[in-house]
Design a protein with these regions (language model features):
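Glycine-rich phosphate/adenosyl-contacting loop at the front of the ribokinase-like
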Residues: 1-66, 71-82, 323-334
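Conserved phosphate-binding/catalytic region of the ribokinase-like
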Residues: 1-8, 17, 159, 208-334
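A short, aliphatic-rich alpha-helical micro-motif
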Residues: 2, 131-133, 186
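A short helix->loop->beta-strand "cap" motif at the edges of active sites that frequently abuts
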Residues: 58, 162-166, 219-222
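A glycine-rich helix N-cap at a beta->alpha junction
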Residues: 79-95
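Conserved phosphate-binding/catalytic loop of the ribokinase/pfkB sugar-kinase fold
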Residues: 91-92, 102-147
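Conserved beta-alpha-beta core of the PfkB/ribokinase-like small-molecule kinase fold
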Residues: 137-213, 231
């Protein structure tokens, strides 16, 4: 009997080219050397979440994204496979694999130079064909930045529902400042994750406690809004959960949201049915997600520290405290 796929992660694939601790950005014609070298890393939401899941012990994870038929596309496939993930890319001959350049001057925030390339062109049909493998959970990231997927979200999510697959969708601010692609699909999404700024852009409400209610009124089911070091606010049914963050020394926040999604998915995959969880099981999944996000930011790189031992250490040292400071309340939703 063929083993059921635990998780399908779809969204963006890209290659990050990173130089940190630069003394300055040179004027035109200048040259500087990167004191810590220049690194090349796999990136993109689908890649990050799938690698995180493999590092947390999931053995049956597939990642889907769009790449070019080029050297960097091959690098992405090899890196996924080495990490324990089955790559299922859509490969284009005429469009290059996407690249993102990250430059950090000592004492300043990161500067990014990105391109819109193959990563934006993932086909809905490619995803729907992979959903025929009936994954237990389907993570769909980069919504707002996938040209064709954004236009057909309800169709893709209904295909997942037809396969009895639980869906978790993660969003980014859209290339065009219009959220219709998401709001029209909210009722098809089992769990939606977004950060506080994204929630504000959709609802016009800065308070996460009010924003989750606004999202529910737009049709969302289970909602998770994260606020970095301020923790998260979630709404499941009529119950709102507010949970503080774990306390860690932040080194690099890259991939923190992806890590949270991976931790949440990993916890739900321990259940018989990932979509029929009790409130306590959901709260623990949020706790594990926050621990994964906290572990992520303690080192450079989007997936470097998202490992079982680091998350277990955080849960053992701070988990009870975070839970004790969390609140659950019944919310009146008109």
């Amino acid at each position: 009997m063929r083993q059921q796929l635990d998780a399908l992660c779809a969204g963006s694939f890209m290659v990050d080219i990173v130089a940190t601790h630069l003394p300055n950005i040179t004027p035109p014609g200048g040259l500087i050397y990167a004191p810590n070298g220049i690194s090349i890393n796999i990136g993109g939401h689908a890649a990050n979440v799938s690698i995180d899941l493999a590092q947390l012990g999931q053995k049956s994870v597939t990642a889907a994204g769009c790449i070019g038929n080029d050297m960097l596309g091959g690098y992405i496939q090899r890196t996924l496979k080495i990490s324990g993930v089955e790559p299922s890319p859509q490969i284009l001959d005429e469009i290059p694999t996407a690249k993102n350049i990250s430059l950090t001057v000592e004492g300043e925030d990161r500067r990014f130079i990105a391109e819109l390339a193959a990563n934006t062109l993932l086909s809905p049909d490619h995803i729907i064909n992979l959903l025929k493998k009936q994954p237990r959970i389907f993570f769909l990231g980069t919504i707002g930045g996938l040209k064709y997927v954004d236009k057909t979200l309800p169709l893709i999510l209904q295909s997942a529902r037809d396969c009895h697959t639980t869906t978790l969708v993660d969003v980014i601010p859209p290339i065009e400042p219009n959220w219709d692609h998401l709001t029209q699909a909210l009722s098809f999404i089992d769990i939606i994750h977004l950060n506080r700024n994204e929630a504000y852009l959709i609802t016009g409400i800065s308070d996460p406690k009010k924003a989750v209610i606004a999202l529910r009124s737009l049709g969302a089911n289970t909602i998770v809004i994260t606020s970095a070091s301020k923790g998260l606010t979630a709404l499941r049914g009529e119950t709102m959960i507010n949970m503080p963050a774990f306390k860690v020394n932040e080194v690099d926040s890259t991939g923190a949201g992806d890590a949270l999604c991976a931790g949440l998915i990993h916890s739900l995959l321990t259940l018989k049915n990932p979509n029929k969880f009790t409130l306590d099981e959901f709260q623990y999944a949020l706790l594990e997600g926050q621990a994964a996000g906290a572990a992520c930011v303690t080192s450079s790189g989007a997936t470097t520290n998202v490992k079982t031992e680091n998350i277990r250490l955080l849960l053992n040292e701070q988990g009870d405290t975070v839970l004790s400071l969390s609140t659950k309340s019944i919310t009146n939703i008109d």
